[in-house]
């Protein structure tokens, strides 16, 4: 079996895929999130290669049944198709380098490429939103070229500006709000990824796609 299922405290259960992260496995996670339907479930949280469901601790719940249900849905998901009701592709304008991308030069040197080549590699891909987490509107994206996978900073920053575009390991993403963080910051976007006044506060849903485009650069 390619998954493990384990409790998370007394109010949650997680199904985790033991295989490497892939878009195929992530689509199966999304499908489970769409199709698990039990009245006592309070929240469904798709993650990277895993899904967690939380439930009412005061409800008489058969946890063994819920565990078997998650496993059954995982097997069913192999032949099912995920339907994203949004499914949009959004172009995200980015200003690369300079004060807005203080780690661009260091990252390009680490990979022995020019800053221009780094930007080309970063903007060439169409990224898929695997899940939204860490903070409201923060998207974890699949599709970063392995040539620019970059370890997180040894010393995280205490304050990263809103809109900062970063690379952390095999991931790239955008900080929707000012926060501490350890990703390598290569640029910044003015696009608002999360706005509580919108009908749909988060700009992206799992399964959506985005492509970074160059708005400007200081190299």
Cite the ranges covered by each PLM segment.
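Glycine-rich active-site loops that engage anionic ligands at enzyme catalytic sites
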Residues: 1-219
